Amino acid sequence: MAPKKTTKKGGPKKRPSAEKRIITSQKRCLINQSFKSKAKTMMKKFEAALKAGDQTSIASGLQLVYSVVDKAVKRGILKHNKAARIKSRATLRANAKI
């Protein structure tokens, strides 16, 4: 392993601000990707519940879709209007089956 860079006082060498932002944005990108994946998985489970036709699973699936989509908006992963579209379409599908 390469020796660690240190300052004159012996502490770790500080990074430039731009480097910190790059690292932070990479971390956030991974977190956002995993949350998007989770949201898509919940929507697929809801679609499977619709195909099965079980009313209780449809209702609980719809609640999960609402919850995950609202959290995505709060985190800034989805835009408000896209979330509204997703929820509206899910509700229409659920009402058609119930």
From Swiss-Prot:
Disulphide-bridged cysteine pairs: none
GO-annotated molecular function: small ribosomal subunit rRNA binding; structural constituent of ribosome
Keyword RNA-binding: yes
Pfam assignment, any one: Ribosomal_S20p
Region described as Disordered: spans on this chain: 1-21
Keywords recorded for this protein, A-Z: Ribonucleoprotein, Ribosomal protein, RNA-binding, rRNA-binding
Skewed-composition ranges (Basic residues): 1-15
One biological process term in Gene Ontology: translation
Record carries keyword Ribosomal protein: yes
Example of a GO cellular component annotation carried by this entry: small ribosomal subunit
Gene3D superfamilies per the UniProt record, alphabetical: Ribosomal protein S20
Family, per entry: Belongs to the bacterial ribosomal protein bS20 family.
Function summary: Binds directly to 16S ribosomal RNA.
Protein name from the UniProt record: Small ribosomal subunit protein bS20
Taxonomic source organism: Chlamydia abortus (strain DSM 27085 / S26/3)
